[in-house]
């Protein structure tokens, strides 16, 4: 991100006077100043000796590169007395970086932002606690710096520095970027650390950058380990640029996603109890069975794995996990997989089961909590009687054994709620050729308990427990002094005025000793939490601790106080005495959980880090329908080539590489337009496991490979969500999408190309009118992989404007290239296709060609009326991208797409899915359909997507072969009774529609001993 700005902070240390040195006996002390930014980079000045008037003069300028990802946005200038064998600390001055940058003024003559020289008082840090005196004269200047690389690449143009920066707003763009990338809590901490406390000491950075004091408070056993900091904001300071709390709130602009769908409202607890009736794998010696099972649980972007049990067919786990569920995740499935641990090879898949989270989240009254509840999944069995959380100890361990055989007894007052006990009938892995006897004899059943709670209920239980522990006299009430002591023990900085408002709400006067009941205090705290959630304000924090006293997790003070409350509520709601282990997310995807350590090491060394949102050759995306994390299918040599090519900006931008990619793309396009290219179609389908059922034509009707590549689909195969509502925009393509509320956010999180701007995107067609419309527009990036359907459609209803074509290069649109220094969207071949709409204004669709793309073909003309979902054009062979630009004041993207994009995760969507809406229109709500309600073809698609089974065409051929074998022509021939003749569905699924016919073949094969 810093490479997009190339800003450098020049700090000119001029003089220091009236400084008390480290050794009064040495009149000729030598002082040195060190400038440090967020402990990531620092430089020092030369030594300076005093003049007769004890004035130290440096006149030295220190340059430090400004990065938009800072651990702490803080500038520290410390002064040291250099002696013979050691350096003695003299004092320091600190600056809040964001406030300092906003105080700089732009100088048009030097094309830089400058401050006037000012004297600043030196203070001591709290850990030194030495007497500091004197002042230091400092001046700051920020300027864009062009490195040798930048100068080389811009050598062909006569662009001036001011042209490259765009305008004097570049610094404001950087400030906005750093505010976006730096958590709100860290900005508040940096502001606190830049102000000395009442004793004229700076809060300590070295020992604890996020807390200045540790106060031992004992509310009860829940609070005895809390460490927190007291607020250290002074009312006045000798800094000329000192900022108050109000100033801090006014200079901060925290971009948020204004949607309740992103706020987790509930927590789901799952206890993995046991698995029964696992099939015996034969060991290497064939003398006994080999089964060391463990369970992998996948939900959305989270994957958990239990510990493994040695040599057993009925493992008992007794392990618990908890995860948040957002509104947009209610339609996701919860996947359970049982695997057999192998020491040297891949872990073997044994059985798989799926449960809809919406079934587990159904709320019931306390009178009849579960008797009328019937899960829709046929393989999910809910036991008749629900259990209380405290009664679940019969199925779990009674106590938790820790080190040195010490029993830990936990108070279970927070363990309310009912546990539902389920038995999930799992399917044996379809990729293994189980015998009919094995399938009939072994039916694995996973036993687990679930309980879900809403966050507000967990918080109220937490408040009740803490307040009861603080009520030492058992009065059940608190006055203002007791309430103030309680919030101080939590590390809160709530003012007396805020606490007094708790009493005023109930018409009570806190200043005459009137009290509130514990329930009234809880209601007041919940009103405060609700107010902060709605207004998204962070003026005060309710709780601030460093370490959780229950699970021991540290660095909690890096989070917002509401996040700390969530963490404590979850920890407090767990019954630690009844479980062996609490699971934490361990893997990126369920596929990664099956790999051995050396496989993961090889993938990391070859393709890069295997992580969600990582900039590597491992492309992981999230399926919007199911929530599963999928790994994009790509040839190994292509994956390695992209990594080697685009990890180096010099190579990718060289003239040879550009020429090579252009020739390769044109040559490949000509090759796939030839009739001989038809032979490539079957291998392409087989490698990418494509579903060809939706194709409008049969495979033998395509004359060239390109005709198949930009194939049309059958009518109705891509239905439009809320088709008659023109206030909702839909996806223009089957693609992997990322969306952002502005170009600035897109450059911060995703597009890392040097100097990417809308001006460069529009090329010679850039105008003032387009600048006003699109300079700060909402942008959607829809990337099409080679295996996707390559026709693109209109996302809105409107009139097509004048289409402009822009020639360019043929760089790949792979995420690794987009997140490199290369400006792919500003240099690749592209078209500008405007659509004038009533609801959204002027929407701009930009088809961008990429590597191997022969051409971009448009199907619409100027002034043509298009409806949402109408075809606009198609790409010939290769990867490609669609950019869709909306005026941000008239459009909002869907919250789930924004959440993934801000985490640098692409979302897999299809044509017709909702992507956004007008500000007045509510977000389109997707409804869950159970697996059993889907038609058979759709069930096959879902399982193919998850398991990576064979293609549908192969399945059809196998089915036809089966009908021939079992048709009216007589009994099948023995030579035809081979396992290869079975369809993929028969090998991988246990559908009732296929079981009867396929079982005949399986039975005969078993009897024949094949």
UniProtKB/Swiss-Prot annotation:
Residues 1-114, 247-370 form the C2 domain. One of its GO terms (biological process) is protein autoprocessing. Binds 1 pyruvoyl group covalently per subunit. Residues 458-493 form the EF-hand domain. The keyword S-adenosyl-L-methionine does not apply. GO terms for molecular function: metal ion binding; phosphatidylserine decarboxylase activity. InterPro entries: C2_dom (IPR000008), C2_domain_sf (IPR035892), PS_Dcarbxylase (IPR003817), PSD-B (IPR033177), PSD_type2_pro (IPR033179). Catalyzes the formation of phosphatidylethanolamine (PtdEtn) from phosphatidylserine (PtdSer). Plays a central role in phospholipid metabolism and in the interorganelle trafficking of phosphatidylserine. Belongs to the phosphatidylserine decarboxylase family. PSD-B subfamily. Eukaryotic type II sub-subfamily. This is Phosphatidylserine decarboxylase proenzyme 2. It comes from Komagataella phaffii (strain GS115 / ATCC 20864). The gene is PSD2.
């Amino acid at each position: 991100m810093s490479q997009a700005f190339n800003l450098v902070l020049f700090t000119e240390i001029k003089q220091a006077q009236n400084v008390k040195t480290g050794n009064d006996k040495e009149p000729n002390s030598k002082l040195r100043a060190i400038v440090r930014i967020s402990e990531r980079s620092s430089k020092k000045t030369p030594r300076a000796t005093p003049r007769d008037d004890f004035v130290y003069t440096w006149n030295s300028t220190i340059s430090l590169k400004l990065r938009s990802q800072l651990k702490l946005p803080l500038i520290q200038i410390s002064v040291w007395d250099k002696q013979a064998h050691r350096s003695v600390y003299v004092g320091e001055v600190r600056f809040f970086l964001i406030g300092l940058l906003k105080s700089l003024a732009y100088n048009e003559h030097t094309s830089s932002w400058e401050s006037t020289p000012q004297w600043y008082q030196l203070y001591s840090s709290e850990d030194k606690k030495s007497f500091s005196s004197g002042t230091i004269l400092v001046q700051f200047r920020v300027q864009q710096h062009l490195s040798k690389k930048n100068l080389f690449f811009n050598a062909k143009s006569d662009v001036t520095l001011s042209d490259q920066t765009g305008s004097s707003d570049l610094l404001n763009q950087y400030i906005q970027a750093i505010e976006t990338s730096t958590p709100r809590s860290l900005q508040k901490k940096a502001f606190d650390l830049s102000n000395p406390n009442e004793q004229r000491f700076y809060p300590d950075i070295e020992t604890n950058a996020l807390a200045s004091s540790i106060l031992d408070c004992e509310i009860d056993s829940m609070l005895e380990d809390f460490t927190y900091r007291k607020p250290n904001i002074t009312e006045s300071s000798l800094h000329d640029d000192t900022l108050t709390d109000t100033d801090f709130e006014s200079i901060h602009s925290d971009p948020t996603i204004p949607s309740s769908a992103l706020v987790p409202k509930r927590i789901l607890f799952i206890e993995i109890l046991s698995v029964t009736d696992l099939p015996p794998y034969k060991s290497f010696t064939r003398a006994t069975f080999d089964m060391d099972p463990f369970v992998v649980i996948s939900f959305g972007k989270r994957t958990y794995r239990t510990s493994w049990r040695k040599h057993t067919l009925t493992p008992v786990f007794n392990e618990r996990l908890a995860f948040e569920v957002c509104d947009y995740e209610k339609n996701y499935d919860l996947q359970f997989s049982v695997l057999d641990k192998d020491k040297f090879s891949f872990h073997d898949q044994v059985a798989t089961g799926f449960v809809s989270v919406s079934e587990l989240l159904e709320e019931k009254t306390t009178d009849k909590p579960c008797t009328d509840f019937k899960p829709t999944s046929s393989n999910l069995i809910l036991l008749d009687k629900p259990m209380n959380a405290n009664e679940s100890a019969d199925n779990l361990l009674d106590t938790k054994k820790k080190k040195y055989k010490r029993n830990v007894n936990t108070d279970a007052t927070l363990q309310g709620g009912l546990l539902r006990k389920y038995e999930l009938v799992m399917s044996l892995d379809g990729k293994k050729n189980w015998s009919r006897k094995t399938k009939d004899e072994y039916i694995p059943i996973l036993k687990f308990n679930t309980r879900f709670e809403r966050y507000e209920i967990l918080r109220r239980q937490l408040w009740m427990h803490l307040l009861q522990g603080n009520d030492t006299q058992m009065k059940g009430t608190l006055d203002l002094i007791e309430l103030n002591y309680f919030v101080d023990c939590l590390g809160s900085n709530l003012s007396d005025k805020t606490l007094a408002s708790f009493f005023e709400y109930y018409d009570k006067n806190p200043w005459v000793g009137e009290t509130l009941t514990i329930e009234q205090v809880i209601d007041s705290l919940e009103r405060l939490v609700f107010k902060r959630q709605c207004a998204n304000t962070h003026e005060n924090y309710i709780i601030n601790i460093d370490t959780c006293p229950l699970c021991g997790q540290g660095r909690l003070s890096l989070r917002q106080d509401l996040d700390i409350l969530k963490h404590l509520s979850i920890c407090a709601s767990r019954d630690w005495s009844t479980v062996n282990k609490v699971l934490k997310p361990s893997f990126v995807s369920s596929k990664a959980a099956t790999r051995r350590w050396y496989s993961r090491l090889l993938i990391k060394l070859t393709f890069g880090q295997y992580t969600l949102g990582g900039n590597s050759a491992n492309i992981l995306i999230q399926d919007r329908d199911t929530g599963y994390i999928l790994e994009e299918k790509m040839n190994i040599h292509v994956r390695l080539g992209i990594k080697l090519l685009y990890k180096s900006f010099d190579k990718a931008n060289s003239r040879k590489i550009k020429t090579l990619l252009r020739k390769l793309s044109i040559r490949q396009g000509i090759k796939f337009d030839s009739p001989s290219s038809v032979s490539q179609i079957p291998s392409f389908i087989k490698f990418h496991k494509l579903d060809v059922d939706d194709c409008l034509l049969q495979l033998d009707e395509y004359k060239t490979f390109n005709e198949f590549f930009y194939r049309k689909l059958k009518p109705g195969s891509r239905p439009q969500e809320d088709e008659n509502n023109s206030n909702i925009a839909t996806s223009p393509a089957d693609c992997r999408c990322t969306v952002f509320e502005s170009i600035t956010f897109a450059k911060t999180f995703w597009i890392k190309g040097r100097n990417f701007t809308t001006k460069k995107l529009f090329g010679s067609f850039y105008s003032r009118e387009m600048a006003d419309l699109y300079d700060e527009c909402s942008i959607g990036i829809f990337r099409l992989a080679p295996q996707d359907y390559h026709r693109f459609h209109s996302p809105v209803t409107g009139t097509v404007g004048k289409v402009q074509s822009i020639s360019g290069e043929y760089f790949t649109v792979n995420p690794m290239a987009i997140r490199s220094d290369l400006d792919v969207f500003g240099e690749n071949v592209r078209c500008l296709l405007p659509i004038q709409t009533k609801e959204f204004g002027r929407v701009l669709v930009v088809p961008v060609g990429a590597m191997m793309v022969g051409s971009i073909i448009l199907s619409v003309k100027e002034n043509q009326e298009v409806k949402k979902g109408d075809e606009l054009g198609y790409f010939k062979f290769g990867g490609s991208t669609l950019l869709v630009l909306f005026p941000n004041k008239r459009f909002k993207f869907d919250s789930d797409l924004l959440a993934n994009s801000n985490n640098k995760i692409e979302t897999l969507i299809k044509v017709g899915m909702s992507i956004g809406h007008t500000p007045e229109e509510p977000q389109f709500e997707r409804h869950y359909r159970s697996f059993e309600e889907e038609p058979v073809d759709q069930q096959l698609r879902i399982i193919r997507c998850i398991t990576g089974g064979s293609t549908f065409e192969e399945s059809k051929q196998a089915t036809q072969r089966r009908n021939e074998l079992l048709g009216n022509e007589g009994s099948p021939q023995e030579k035809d009774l081979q396992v290869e003749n079975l369809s993929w569905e028969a090998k991988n699924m246990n559908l009732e529609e296929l079981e009867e016919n396929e079982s005949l073949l399986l039975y005969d094969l078993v009897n024949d001993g094949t």
